[in-house]
Every structure is written in C-alpha cells, then in structure tokens.
Amino acid sequence: MIVLPNKVRIFINDRMKKDIYLGISNFGFENDIDEILGIAHLLEHLLISFDSTNFLANASTSRSYMSFWCKSINSATESDAIRTLVSWFFSNGKLKDNFSLSSIRFHIKELENEYYFRNEVFHCMDILTFLSGGDLYNGGRIDMIDNLNIVRDMLVNRMQRISGSNIVIFVKRLGPGTLDFFKQTFGSLPACPEIIPSSIPVSTNGKIVMTPSPFYTVMVKINPTLDNILGILYLYETYHLIDYETIGNQLYLTVSFIDETEYESFLRGEAILQISQCQSINMNYSDDYMMNIYLNFPWLSHDLYDYITRINDDSKSILISLTNEIYASIINRDIIVIYPNFSKAMCNTRDTQQHPIVVLDATNDGLIKKPYRSIPLMKRLTSNEIFIRYGDASLMDMITLSLSKQDISLKRNAEGIRVKHSFSADDIQAIMESDSFLKYSRSKPAAMYQYIFLSFFASGNSIDDILANRDSTLEFSKRTKSKILFGRNTRYDVTAKSSFVCGIVRGKSLDKTSLVEMMWDLKKKGLIYSMEFTNLLSKNTFYLFTFTIYTDEVYDYLNTNKLFSAKCLVVSTKGDVENFSSLKKDVVIRV
C-alpha cells in the first residue's frame, strides 16, 4: 500500500482484470438523507463518460461509497484507461464542479429508467436506509427534474466533500509516471473534506421487517472492530449466506437461512451458529470485495494481506469472541429481522415514494438464554460450473439466485447460460426447493419476458406454445444452421405486464462493440438504463432486449439506425392483461 501525503491509498493488484479501480468512501447515498434522495446516484451517472470502442467501464453507488473502474480494449493502453478515469473527476487540473442543466436533465431521465428496470427485475428494498430516515429506494426519481438548480448546487456541494482520506485506488501496474499523475490529481485534494456532511441518523434496531426476500435473514449488530472484520472475512471465505452491511459507523453481520425452523431457533436464542475452523484462510477475494472492505472501513491502516497471519493464527479466539457478540445481540435485540413476505395487501407503513412495507417490533417473547443446539452453515467449494439450456425448467430459478448472490456469475450464449458458483449440488438444490426462494423467484415475472421473446425469435415455436410453457421457456432448436427471414413489418405492438422493446436485428458490420456503443448512446439520451443482447446462430444477427418507459423513442432510434439492414422489433405497453395477438400471425419470422 502506498499512502500519499493527503492520505490517498494506492494498491497494486496485478490479478484484477480492470486497469484502474477507484473508490470513494463516505460518499454513497446514505449522504442523501435529509437532502434530495438520488443526488449521489445522479453524480455517478454524470461523472462517468468514455469511448466504448476503446474502453470497458462502469460505476456504482452503494449505501456508503461510490466506485468507478476502467479497462482498455482494442488499441487503447492501460495508461489511457487511467487517464480516462481520472478525467471523470478532474478538468484542466481542477476538480470538476460544474454540470450543465441539460446533462442533469438527461441523466435524471436515465435514473427513472433505472428505477423502472430495477423494480421490474429486482425487489429494491434497502431496509437499513429506510430505518435510518431514507427511502426503500434511494437511486433518484424523475421528480428531481422539478428542482434542477437546487440539484446542481447539491452536486457541486457533494464534489467539494471529496478528500484524500476518502480515496482508494487499485491499479494493475504502477510506474513512476502513473504515480506522479496520481500525485498531481487525487494527491492534490485536501486531506479532509472542505465541507463536512451532517452525521447520518442512527438506524433503529429491534425491528422485524416483512418484505420480499429469497431467504430468512437476520442482521446482527456488532462492534466495528478489527477482530470482528477479520472474523467476517473468515466466515465469508468459508461459508455461504453470510455477509455484512454498514450504515454510518454501524456494522451488521447478515446471516441468511433457507430453513424457517433454524431461523426461528436462532432468533429465540436456542441455537448458535456452528462455526468450524478451516485449515487456512487465503484471502483470495475478488477485487470488488477487497475494495468494499477498504471503503466501508476507511480507518484500516494496513493492506489486508498484512493480517493474513493474524486471521489464521488467532482464528479461534477471533471466532469465539464474534460468536459471543452475535449471541449477545440476539438476546439484547440489537437486530433487524427480515421475514419473507410477498403479500401486496399487507402494509403498515410506507416510504415517501409510497412503497408499502410491514415493520414490527422484535419483542423478547419466547427468548431462551441458554442455547442447546447449533445450526450448520453451507460451506463454500473452491469452484463449480454448470450449463443450463434455455429450455431447462431451472433456468429462471438460477437467474434469480445469481441476482441475489454477487459471487455467482452468468455468461449467456445462443443456447443457454453458463453459471460459475461455489455451492455444492445438494446446497444449491436445497435453496432452489425452499419455499421462500420459490416465491421470490416467481414474484418478479418481468425477467421472464426477455427469455420468452428470445425463445420466440431463436426457435421455430409459436408464441402460443411458448406462453403455454413459460416456466421452461421451451428449448431452442438444436439445428446448427438456421436461416432467419425477416418480414416486411418492423414493429409489433403487444401488451405485457412490463414496458420494454425487444427483437432481432441484422447488419453486415453489426457486432458486440457497435451494440455496446449504441447502448451507451441511448443511456446518454436518458432513454434506457441497460440493453441486453445475445448473438444468434444466424450470421451478424442479434437479439436485443431493454426495459424502458420511453418505448416509442427507443423504437424510433432502433428503427432508423443505419447499422441495421433488417430488423423485427416488439414494443410492449404495460397493462394488467397480456395481449400478444399481433405475433400470432405468421408474418413476423420464419426459421
């Protein structure tokens, strides 16, 4: 670890795929409480800008921090990627503090699309922020557009809070020129922020929250000490369904269960977690997980690898102390309990955006202060991989699981998805067969539309057959050579329970790079949040899908795009009753 005079921390990580990865601690949307919710997320969208033909890049805003990364591709170099990312924050050697109203307006529209996307596919319910005075969704809404001048002032104010002590930088390689460049830019920031934000309200403990969830989860408040952080690292590397959450200076260990009986035993204090010592902890974490640790605990004064001897040699005492603290929090009700609930009728409170939720007090009734049993945890395997065809009945369940677990990766091709994970076969089956997970998986049917129409365009099946078997989406045609013939009509209007545009496009020079560039152009115009595309077996032919509230504008953009020599697009209007009758005539596509 290299520490600049203003406390910027720089790490060399030659194993990461990114060229540069930058995080800003104490800079997430928890800072929006008592301001306009969404300022942090809007700032993220305003800052990131790059040439998608030369770079891959992304950014994210979490509760307590913001992070950005960039990777060079094609003819660009690592140095180009570093300079591109730094340019998001600095202009002519000075920290950016000016944002045009037109750009702010476009990105607010994009935020509204992201809200729509996330609520169609996920259950975006941030319990901790809600209990601390925020909302269940804190990513920004379209009504921000009514206060553009105030929003712009808040964005400038937020930029002035950035200080050297907030900055963490990972680089793949660090030469003298790069280090000097960092000193001239991020190294020029003040060691402490020019504007000190107000303290974040303390969240309320001793609450039971009934909300959609794939698991029965208990958030246990523990002290944010070094030993407890090492204990969390130990548990995370060894077991599934254990993680942590932070808000302000508070730390919660999250423990999830698939068995309701075990969950209730843990809550009543009659059972403790069965934590076994493993042979060794390697700290072989992803760069995302490492960055999160440094940002959530900015007071860590050493490289995490400096603690590898301590976490292994002192694991017994660390885990005993952590186990005792967990149990004390259970007894004292320093917990937030999440109980899976999928009823739309049950509600006893709402956030300012009128999202309904049930919040109850966690009482001491039935507490047993002498545990007499232990609960086994799901152990991690080194690595596992499976391939699921689009016709497999478990397809949507696996997609749902990957969306609820950050350490599961999906890679899609024309025939199915390849899934990398670290579960045993028995554990993954137990999760997918659990009652709460099955209800969660079925509670957001919008994600299914992407695969319904992918199956329609890539197979010879009719829309009626596909809809009749939507739980398995039907297996694709196994013919390796299929010729897609486009009809005269380029637009088919349907009614579904989600608003989206999808279809197949073909072009002589069409490739993934051009489609990514197209996606970013649509994002800059505020018309979409993201666009998925799948390369079909026919040459230069892709399937596109995007959730959007601006369906006509997106259709017009795609319909007039000169890269497409042929196209067939479906435009869905949101409604209570599905109507796909326009696709029943044999005029759309023949395989």
Swiss-Prot record:
It is found in: Virion. SUPFAM superfamilies: LuxS/MPP-like metallohydrolase. The keyword Lyase does not apply. GO terms for biological process: proteolysis; viral life cycle. Binds 1 zinc ion. It is an enzyme of class 3 (hydrolase). Zn(2+) binds at residues 41, 45, 112. Undergoes proteolytic processing during the course of infection. May be cleaved into 46 kDa and 22 kDa products (Potential). One of its GO terms (cellular component) is virion component. Its EC number is 3.4.24.-. Pfam families: Peptidase_M44. Belongs to the peptidase M44 family. This is Metalloendopeptidase OPG085. It comes from Vaccinia virus (strain Copenhagen).
